[in-house]
Swiss-Prot record:
Gene3D superfamilies: 3.30.1370.110. Residues 485-567 form the Smr domain. Residues 215-259 form the CUE domain. PROSITE patterns: SMR (PS50828). It comes from the Eukaryota. This is Polyadenylate-binding protein-interacting protein 7. Expressed in cauline leaves, stems, rosette leaves, immature siliques and primary inflorescences. Signal peptide: none annotated. One of its GO terms (molecular function) is mRNA binding.
């Protein structure tokens, strides 16, 4: 193979030299390797021989066209037909045609393997395709049919068997023209090829939506109607436009609605009977709503049976419709878009009770006329309330806000009166001292100090009254190993003194019983100091005291409530 390569190189290099310097006998010199080809060569060897012969033939063609050679194309073809084997005889007609459209180095066969499955990709075509699909007339120039076109037919014929390769090999000059498919054809082909893949319809829809948006050319409303036959086309269109023409979001909402409707039907079909709820009319106060004419209407729980007709359409019995919370629809008019928008803010797994102007807010997000007529909705709600009351212990209620403010004002009123008198006496004493009446200034200062002592005594009594009222002796806010220390209404110095005393008592109790005690300390969030120049000082002071003085780590399960563990 090295000899072949070396033999072809001088001939190729000769084409770049001027015709006047060429050896006139160089065209008649043929290497010995080309006269007697090796019989045991592989496909790679044949390929390289083909490349060498093609380059030599090209050189001969160039010389026939120049003034240095007197051979015609026919003489060159006859010459090489006698000198080269039949299977590597070059086709001068094809190469002449290629010379008109490509340069001398555009067609390279050096790295070509005749038995490579991807060989057709190495031949660029001017028509936009790949391979010699438009030039199959190569075989007509050879008698035995063992030409290059015959060998290149294998990958071309295999394109029909491999759809992926065929689609790649038959690319058009404008590939974006064929990007849009028919969604119905795509759905039909997938269903015929894979009738059941173990996925639900909604999973298949999600797979379809995750594809490129340009691959579908179908009306979104028609697509939704085909996937959700239980809903009206008008309602689907309203939901689709209400979601900003987001098809994925619309399908997710419709899927949740369909699942909720199926769950409601299963509850109605089940033969389980519910006990009548033990509720009084006070549990269901009359709610005020506005009808279609804007006139307020009053109705209680017994009128729910009459409103059940608004959840069904008189024309289409097989459709499922929902009504929005704050409005009551007339027969046949469905506020479906509001129901879908409300779905995002509702929890389908929990039953909610809202005290607002909604006519149907006492039941959860999934309801129908059957549940209202049979009274099962209220029964389910009452059963859930009873079960929660039995399983959960009674919470510890701590009054805050106005209750604390009123108590503070009432019990601290006497101390504030003494404080005002003290300030008046101190101001008069200062004025008397400034004018030089020191005796009067001293007398007024003594009266001010007396009122200051009375103020402190009043604050002490108010502190004890406030703490005992917020933390009674037989306090109901202590259960098990949990204790509650409520410091609402106390000043910082008073709260720290009380906290130090209570923690010492609880620590002694924990050591005596050898148990861990969980202490909750209620310090508030500073609502009473809101609007003043100074922020709330009690929470910061208590936190610093626990860390620095007591050495206790605390956590804050909610704002204004600290939790420590003593053992």
């Amino acid at each position: 193979m090295s000899l072949t390569k070396k033999a072809s190189e001088p001939k190729l290099s000769g084409t770049s030299i001027k015709p006047t310097t060429l050896n006139p006998h160089a065209a008649e010199f043929v290497p010995f390797t080309l006269r007697s080809p090796s019989s045991g060569g592989t496909s790679t060897l044949d390929t390289r021989l083909l490349a060498s012969s093609s380059s030599v033939g090209k050189a001969v063609l160039d010389r026939t066209e120049s003034s240095a050679s007197h051979h015609s194309d026919e003489e060159a073809r006859q010459f090489w037909s006698h000198q080269l084997p039949d299977d590597i005889t070059p086709d001068f007609g094809l190469m002449t045609q290629d010379d008109n459209s490509y340069g001398s180095g555009s067609l390279s066969l050096a790295n070509l393997s005749l038995f490579d499955g991807n060989e057709a990709e190495k031949f660029p075509s001017a028509s936009g395709g790949y391979g010699f699909s438009d030039q199959t007339g190569l075989a007509s120039h050879n008698a035995n049919g063992n030409s290059l076109a015959d060998k290149s037919r294998y990958p071309i014929s295999s394109f029909g068997e491999d759809p992926q390769r065929q689609s790649f090999m038959q690319l058009s000059p404008k590939p974006w023209d064929k990007q849009i498919m028919n969604a119905e054809q795509l759905l039909g082909n997938d269903r015929e090829r894979n009738p059941f893949s173990g996925k639900s319809r909604h999973g298949f829809v999600n797979d379809m939506i995750t594809e490129s948006p340009g691959d579908m050319e179908v009306n979104p409303v028609d697509f939704l109607a085909s996937q959700f036959p239980g809903f009206a086309a008008e309602s689907l269109a309203e939901v689709y436009f209400a979601n900003g023409c987001d098809l994925q979001l619309t399908i997710e909402m419709l899927t949740q609605l369909e699942l909720q409707v199926d769950g409601g039907l299963n509850q109605n079909i089940s033969p389980k009977t519910y006990a009548p709820p033990s509720l009084t009319p006070m549990d269901f106060p009359a709610l005020s709503i506005s009808n279609s004419h804007g006139i307020p209407a009053q109705f209680g729980g017994d009128d729910l049976q009459q409103t059940g007709n608004h959840y069904q359409s008189p024309e289409k019995d097989n459709m499922f419709f929902f009504k929005s919370g704050p409005s009551v629809s007339q027969p046949g008019a469905i506020d479906y878009v509001s129901a879908v928008r409300k779905l995002a803010s509702q929890d389908s797994g929990m039953w909610k009770y809202e005290r607002n102007d909604s006519a149907d807010s006492s039941i959860g997000s999934s309801r129908n006329s059957g549940a209202y007529k049979s009274g099962r909705g209220r029964s389910i709600y009452s059963d859930k309330l009873q079960s929660r009351a039995q399983t959960r212990p009674a919470p510890v209620w701590v009054e805050t806000g106005d209750a604390v403010g009123n108590m503070y004002s009432e019990l601290r009123e006497e101390a504030r009166d003494y404080a005002r008198l003290r300030n008046v006496y101190f101001e008069q004493a200062r004025q008397a001292y400034l004018v030089g009446n020191k005796a009067l200034a001293k007398e007024l200062s003594v009266k001010g100090q007396l009122h200051n002592m009375q103020m402190k005594a009043a604050h002490g009594k108010a502190q004890e009254a406030i703490y005992r009222q917020r933390n009674p002796v037989g306090q109901g806010n202590s259960r098990g190993n949990e204790r509650m220390i409520d410091l609402h209404g106390l000043h910082v110095s008073e709260a720290l003194q009380v906290l130090k005393h209570e923690l010492s008592v609880l620590r002694s109790t924990a050591r005596a019983t050898q148990e861990r005690l969980q202490i909750y300390i209620c310090v508030g969030t500073g609502h009473h100091t809101r609007g003043s120049r100074t922020p709330a000082r009690l929470p910061v002071a208590v936190q610093r005291y626990l860390l620095e003085e007591e050495g206790l780590d605390y956590s804050e399960p909610q704002a204004g409530l600290l939790r420590v563990i003593i053992y």
